[in-house]
């Protein structure tokens, strides 16, 4: 696998830097990098991996061209996504990751997809892009690569349920009253090292809700066949229950380099339509294995939807479909940012999201309606945030 040529979109973020760890360990060539505004880290990556093409945020394009001499520098991640590569790893966070995903799939690229918003907000549009251009998709999330591995060799008609595990976040065992939770407390995830947005989503269980929606879209099952189990040890990442009663599970250490490496291995033969699971030949080990026997106690419990209503809101949006997943994603991004900056409280996050969902207009999902609904939901969420903690505009 050392001859693999990668494009890494979102290279300076958490998944992006860990992808480059995998590339470094396995000797992959990195032909293209795309980042936002973290020019210092990007410059280090360019010096090490010597890509031919780099994309940056337009606001730093002139400075980047000056500092990254000898490299072609652009301000268009979608152009970067179609550069020659064996695998495109899209680690861009948020809706800005959708156009590059679409471009890569329409260009026939093999995409290892960490941008969960692509499948949460616009799944059928992404599958249309893959069908049009011959692109392939494999997810990067540990839970979804776990499901992918469990489904390998199985007929989708034999699948009764897909099960995703959740660590439960930093507040799974307390405090009883979450109203006074601070951003600093919420950012202390017990198992995983992630970016701030995903870490807060894990604390509210919204991350698991988004993963449930993504899972249903990836594997072509209704949300009623995608379950969640809280597993504090974060060893079992996913399981598949088959119609004969058998249960297959995937487990491993809480190290994102493993699912990233598997997604890179699997992407060239990845999915072109929901549930199109073909497996992969695996590369060399990139992290420490769990060892055997596996010592210690494993716990599994049902999630508390009263304490963590964001998970229930995600099921609601996913079951409704249409434009509600777009509104959910946009409202959550605004709410999490407001919480991190002290503008609203922890418990205001689900209240704000619910208000936006209640007010979301109906309509069919198209690229235009997605963009319009995203903008509307963000603006409405910002209005609700303006009332502040405990304001009538949020909780009413």
From Swiss-Prot:
Needed co-factor(s): Mg(2+); Mn(2+)
Binding-site residues, NADPH: 12-15, 36-38, 117, 195
Catalytically driven reaction(s): 2-C-methyl-D-erythritol 4-phosphate + NADP(+) = 1-deoxy-D-xylulose 5-phosphate + NADPH + H(+)
Assigned EC number: 1.1.1.267
Keyword Membrane in annotation: no
UniProt keyword terms in alphabetical order: Isoprene biosynthesis, Manganese, Metal-binding, NADP, Oxidoreductase
Taxonomic superkingdom: Bacteria
InterPro entries, sorted: DXP_reductoisomerase, DXP_reductoisomerase_C, DXP_reductoisomerase_N, DXPR_C, DXPR_C_sf, NAD(P)-bd_dom_sf
Binding locations of 1-deoxy-D-xylulose 5-phosphate: 116, 142-143, 167, 189, 202, 207-208, 211
GO molecular function per UniProt: 1-deoxy-D-xylulose-5-phosphate reductoisomerase activity; manganese ion binding; NADPH binding
Function: Catalyzes the NADPH-dependent rearrangement and reduction of 1-deoxy-D-xylulose-5-phosphate (DXP) to 2-C-methyl-D-erythritol 4-phosphate (MEP).
Family: Belongs to the DXR family.
Entry protein name: 1-deoxy-D-xylulose 5-phosphate reductoisomerase
Organism of derivation: Deinococcus radiodurans (strain ATCC 13939 / DSM 20539 / JCM 16871 / CCUG 27074 / LMG 4051 / NBRC 15346 / NCIMB 9279 / VKM B-1422 / R1)
Phylogenetic classification of the source organism: Bacteria, Thermotogati, Deinococcota, Deinococci, Deinococcales
